[in-house]
Structures are given as C-alpha cells and as structure tokens.
C-alpha cells in the first residue's frame, strides 16, 4: 500500500501512530508512565510490595502481576465502572493476564526476590490498541521500579532480561497494516496482536479472522510487519529510559 488515503488515518501501511512515552507521570508509584499510541492514552504504574502470593511462600522468588481497566468515558460512550457492576468482564481479565504474561517473559523472578511487582494499566482514552500500548508502557514503568530497587540495595541486580513490547496488525482493505486504530480495527478482515522481546523472540500471537479467513502468506506478512513495528517500539522504549 503506497496510497496513504487507503487508511482512514492517512498513514502508510507500515507506519506506527505517533508514539510517546512519558516517564515519572505520577509521583507516588515506583514507576509511572503515560504511553500514547496516537489518541490511545494509558497510564501504567509499577508498585512494589514486600510480599508474594501464597503459592510462592518459602520459595524465595518474586512475582509480577497486572491489572487493567478503562475510565468510564475512555470510549465514545460512557460505560459503567466494573467496580460498580461488581464484576470484571472477560475482556478485562484476558487483557490483564496478557500483560502479566508478557512482562514475566522478560523477568528473572528469582532475582526479584520475595516481593511482588504490581502493574496497573488504566486507559484514559481508547482509540484501538489499548492492550498493546499497555504492555509497551508497563515495561518502561517496571524498568523504572526495579532500577529504584537496585539503587536502594533491595535487590542485587535487575531482574529484567530483555525488552518487551507489543503491537497490533491486521488485514485492512486486503492489505497488511500496522498499529490499527479504532476505525481500522472495526473494519479489518483480520486482527492480530503480537508481543515480542527486544531480541526478536515471540511471547504471544493472538490472531482472529474477523471477516474472510487469512492465508499463511498473509499471516507471515503480518508477523513481518509486527516485528518491524516492535523493533521501533523497543527503540522508543530505550530512548525514553535513557532520557
């Protein structure tokens, strides 16, 4: 796709939205990041607790877990808070488990010691790709948190073994495109979320045919596109952490 008008956003097929990572966004959490993928904005915080879940007692290793939520008016119409409904949706549970799995893939939990790193991802504005933005921002928040643990002498070394980031790809108008916004996500034939490490290893691939089935050739093209996009996201993570 060379004609940018084929995408509602006017972007090239292989072009990310404008991605911004703002560290130290709030003052209380050990790590706090505002991550923006275009009009999708997520606050990601990392908090350290000197305890572990019951199933890890006496093992000496740590744990990392995540929670995810959306503000009532993060979308076009208001939705009730899940706390008011008294129950999390299946979507919320799925996304927060994904965030936790993604981050644990690049953590040495033994090096973290007997403590828990809580990652909270709160969507303040949604325009597609909230889970991928959450993973990308949560990594930076987690990095800041463990850097403080090392500096304070609470752990001997960083438990982080690699970078991790995530991006969406999809078949839109018969063409593989990168980083779908809401308009594209709502109209695409295939929607795929890809999580990868900085070294290029796959952590998770979630792909669904929303319309027409996709071929192996199309899947390979989508994965290639995702890999290139995640490489750019990792570069942005590094730049943010070095700033």
Curated annotation (Swiss-Prot):
It comes from Burkholderia pseudomallei (strain 668). Phosphorolytic 3'-5' exoribonuclease that plays an important role in tRNA 3'-end maturation. Removes nucleotide residues following the 3'-CCA terminus of tRNAs; can also add nucleotides to the ends of RNA molecules by using nucleoside diphosphates as substrates, but this may not be physiologically important. Probably plays a role in initiation of 16S rRNA degradation (leading to ribosome degradation) during starvation. It catalyses: tRNA(n+1) + phosphate = tRNA(n) + a ribonucleoside 5'-diphosphate. Pfam families: RNase_PH, RNase_PH_C. InterPro entries: ExoRNase_PH_dom1, ExoRNase_PH_dom2, ExoRNase_PH_dom2_sf, PNPase/RNase_PH_dom_sf, Ribosomal_Su5_D2-typ_SF, RNase_PH, RNase_PH_bac-type, RNase_PH_CS. HAMAP family: RNase_PH. This is Ribonuclease PH. One of its GO terms (molecular function) is 3'-5'-RNA exonuclease activity. Homohexameric ring arranged as a trimer of dimers. PANTHER family: EXOSOME COMPLEX COMPONENT, EXOSOME COMPLEX COMPONENT RRP41.
């Amino acid at each position: 796709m060379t004609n940018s008008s084929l995408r509602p956003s006017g972007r090239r097929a292989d072009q990310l939205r404008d991605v911004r990572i703002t560290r130290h966004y709030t003052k209380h959490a050990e790590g706090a990041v505002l991550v923006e993928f275009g009009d999708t904005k997520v606050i990601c915080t990392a908090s350290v607790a000197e305890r572990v879940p019951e199933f890890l007692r006496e093992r000496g290793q740590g744990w990392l877990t995540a929670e995810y939520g959306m503000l009532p008016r993060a979308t076009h119409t208001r939705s009730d808070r899940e706390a008011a409904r008294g129950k999390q949706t299946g979507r919320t549970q799925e996304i927060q488990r994904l965030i936790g799995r993604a981050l644990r893939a690049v953590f040495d939990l033994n090096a973290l010691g007997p403590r828990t790193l809580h990652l909270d991802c709160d969507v303040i504005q949604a325009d597609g790709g909230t889970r991928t933005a959450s993973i990308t921002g949560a990594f930076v928040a987690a990095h800041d948190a463990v850097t403080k643990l090392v500096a304070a002498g609470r752990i001997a070394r960083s438990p982080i073994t690699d970078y991790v980031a995530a991006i969406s790809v999809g078949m839109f108008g018969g063409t593989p495109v990168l980083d779908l916004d809401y308009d594209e996500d709502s109209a695409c034939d295939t929607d795929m979320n890809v999580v990868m490490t900085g070294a290029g290893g796959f952590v998770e691939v979630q792909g669904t045919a929303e319309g027409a089935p996709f071929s192996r050739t199309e899947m390979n093209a989508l994965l290639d596109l995702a890999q290139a996009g995640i490489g750019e996201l990792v570069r942005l993570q590094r730049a943010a952490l070095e700033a």
